[in-house]
Regions:
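…; additionally, a secondary subgroup of soluble metalloenzymes is captured
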Residues: 1-114, 120-220, 224-228
Length: 228
């Protein structure tokens, strides 16, 4: 395990030096297996991303978008071309072509399933989640959709009704992003919180694995209200 000082210095170097993507991926792979899994490309495909035949190019667009997002997140920079894409998305809203989350959940097989309501769990973590599930011997199925607006938690949890109001709420990720007393962007610009984000997700996946092994639950459904 790396110390917090080592993690900070590693992220600081990524932020202040201009590495090629190949150099960035290589350095990350040698320093942190968790960060390496996070940076792996997650492909939006015909299985996890259902869209109409006329919108299939959206899958490649989203694949590229989130890969660029993750690289810029850990290097604490925004490229002008990426900012242009964000502004374009804000106007065109291509993500509305994805299935609504409520539609996806209403069609899931929820028999003997436990809902894990993971606040602020975004698409950016899917490559990490998928790899960790495989490591823990868990069979994972991913479905990507869009949430309704406003995306704040209070107004954006209609999916709970499909589980009879019973669920396990995981707030740590959202608390880390918005209310942390340790990671303060006003004081430290480097995204050192990424390591704790991945720890929180990993801890929950291991908890789910334990519950499945103990047969406390037979199926886990992870749903998020919002996230990058």
């Amino acid at each position: 395990d790396r110390s917090e000082t080592e993690e900070f210095e590693f992220i600081r170097c990524l932020c202040i030096y201009d590495y090629t993507e190949e150099e960035l991926y290589s350095a990350t792979k040698h320093f942190s297996s968790a960060l390496d899994l996070y940076l792996r490309k997650f492909s939006f495909d015909g299985v996890n991303t259902k869209v109409s035949d006329s919108d299939i190019t959206l899958r490649d667009i989203l694949t590229q978008y989130f890969q660029e997002y993750k690289v810029q997140k850990i290097t604490n920079r925004i490229h002008p071309s990426f900012e242009n894409t964000i502004n374009k998305f804000a106007i065109e809203r291509p993500y509305n072509k994805l299935r609504p989350r409520s539609s996806i959940i209403s069609q899931l097989d929820k028999e003997k399933a436990e809902l894990f309501f993971f606040d602020a769990l975004g698409v950016e973590y899917l490559s990490f989640i998928k790899a960790k599930c495989e490591e823990y011997g868990l069979i994972v199925e991913i479905s990507i959709g869009h949430c309704e607006l406003p995306s704040i938690t209070e107004k954006n949890k209609e999916f709970i009704q499909y589980f009879g109001g019973k669920y396990r709420k995981i707030d740590e990720l959202d608390e880390l992003k918005h209310h942390s007393q340790i990671y303060d962007y006003e004081k430290i610009k480097e995204p050192i919180h990424i390591f704790r984000e991945l720890e929180i997700i990993d801890e929950e996946l291991r908890r789910i694995q334990s519950l499945l092994v103990q047969e406390t639950i037979t199926k886990a459904i992870i749903v998020s209200d919002h996230g990058a």
